[in-house]
Amino acid sequence: MDYIRVIKENIDKEHICCAMSGQQSLAKKEWLKQRFEEGLVFYRSAERGKCFIEYIPAENAWVPIDAAGWLYINCLWVSGSLKGHGYSSELLEECLRDAKAQGKNGVCILCAEGRKREFLADPKFLTHKGFKVSDISDCGINLMYLPLAESAQPPKFKDCAKHPKVEENGFVLYYTDQCPYTYYWVPKVQEAAKEHGIPFKAIHITEKETAQNVPAPVTTYALFRDGKFVTQSIQSDKKFLKLAAE
């Protein structure tokens, strides 16, 4: 497989895999343009489809972790006809090569405890590749890491991520433009909540400093209900209404 590194100079003409076109793609691309200056790398297959890795120096990651000297993987996604050909391994190998070249301690990434969850990495794949759990959030989301330096201090969640909670009742959503699907679905859920009289508050995170102190281990999409973390899975309006009815 041939790969392309999406950079500031070519992003306007290249697709970004998870959003091929439309306004949701533009929102994601604008977010990426700002992150490139902070060291973000977006590396994808030359073939059209969902096959890419996105990572950034952990100091600039939009998640509440203490991981100075590490690379943080925002997303590693291979699906559809491109799945099952070893491309995930190739993408990860490129990230590790880059980490070594930069003299990083290693790489880290979020996953669910024990099983694959939507919008999180597969823990079985990571374990097979040598990753270990460095920290665990109360909501069952783990921080996994693969060290390149034996003496490196493992990355950790900040307390706000390790013990996720909010004070408000009803539904509270924190989200960013890191995932293009939020651009489409968050307004749909807001509208559905309003129509059905469901208390719902959406907080759009637009700054790194805010993201690094969100009361959840994920910031791309973190939904709370009556103070408790519910899911990192981006909800459609129908899925949200079903959840609200439970």
Residue positions per predicted region:
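Short amphipathic alpha-helix that is part of the acyltransferase structural core
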Residues: M1-R48, D159-A161, N169, Y181, ...
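Conserved GNAT acetyl-CoA-binding A-motif
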Residues: A99-R117
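Conserved acetyl-CoA-binding loop-helix of GNAT-fold acetyltransferases
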Residues: V78, G84-K100
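Conserved beta-strand in the GNAT
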Residues: R44, R48-E59, Y72, W77
